């Protein structure tokens, strides 16, 4: 989370905290929740074999969002600012990491 949030904040953007990445295993959406905001060296320990997504929502304005009550899926920024989201799936290996999907 520290890398994502520090990069976004350095460039004048905010990071949504209500949504984040997740573990991938037998089921697609599994624990742990991957928060995209944090302090360096304070997050969970990454160990070989872990597979998870990194999928931050980055906003041009404030970080606050709401979900459309009509479809319970579409997310909007509360201040009407623009937002972008992308997803990577990452495998932790014995020697580092491997990006499985972009």
Label the predicted regions.
Residues 1-102:
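Active-site neighborhoods and metal-handling regions in enzymes and metal-associated proteins
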